[in-house]
Amino acid sequence: MDILLYFTVHWGAMTDLANKQKPRWGKKFKDKRHWPSTNELYVVRGMYFLDLDWVENWDVELEEMNRGKVGHPYEFPESLIQLQGLWKAKNIPYRMIEGITRQLFNIAGLPAYNNYTTVCRRINRLDVQIRLPEGTVIELTFEDGTGFQAINGGEYLREKYGKKNRMWVQVVMLGDPKTKEPVGFEVNLVPSSEPESAIRQLENMIEQNIEVKGFGSDGAMDDKRLWNACDEYGINAVIKPDKDARSDGESPQRNWNVKYRNKHGYDKWAKKVGYGMRWPATEGIFSAIKRIFGEQLLARSDVGLVQEAGLKVWAYHRLKHGVVG
């Protein structure tokens, strides 16, 4: 038995190594980054986890938040909660967040500190949606979904939503391939239709007077509802059609893409429509989020799981912009 186990483990490892040593297809990647400035950028990002520039406006911010408020007034400004939300996105427990805030109160002149129950309540109410300025023009955005692992709420999810949906919280994101930033996202406890999520997000952007010129995704999103939505809103669709797709369907755009791909081949089609930009707009962003903030969720409740997953995407977007308070 031990020999069989040894053989299985080591043969698998050797097979993986052999696969990794195979020559990669396509052009060899050339890293053109200027490493001194790139390194400094990553160092500066760490400063945002302790950015206290907003503290001087503590009283002004509280006064604005409490103007016209009914009931008990806010005691802690939203900027503090946003900073604590950044820590929470790193999977720091609420009690430890209280401890960090206490130390800032002791050594950095923070006017006051909140206890962990207040931190939890305020973070779960924090608006983590990405809000682009009105009039923003998005030349091209790609959609993809991923999952974050609910390590404490796994049993709860299994009991409430069924065995198939246990332990993973779905995030459907729209990303910009040029800025390599998320421009919108949706969190679902129970995995839902990605095409429907993409349509909702596109419609929300249009309602906010944000112009989306192009939208793309992989073959899993080859859905007539999504093609028709792009036709309706005048959005250039860069969606990979199914290999057996017909070219006489409802969507003029889909028909054109199918005909061009069938005539010229996948590679020329992908180059023509810019499909190769999908990776930096989706998988690249998800990879960065999970490297910085992890893919595990510590929350147990519905609200906590949804908020914690959203916090990770929101926090990454703020880090990219150098914004905390």
Placement of each model-derived feature along the sequence:
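Basic, short loop/linker segments at the boundary and entry of helix-turn-helix/winged-helix-like folds
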Residues: 39-89
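Intrinsically disordered, low-complexity and often Lys/Arg-enriched segments
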Residues: 1-25, 325
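Helix-centered, glycine/charged polyanion-binding patches within enzymatic domains
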Residues: 15-31, 219-290
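Conserved, mostly hydrophobic/aromatic
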Residues: 34
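Basic, amphipathic alpha-helical segments enriched in Lys/Arg and hydrophobic/aromatic residues
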Residues: 86-89, 267-325
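Polybasic low-complexity intrinsically disordered regions
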Residues: 68-92, 99, 112-233, 247, ...
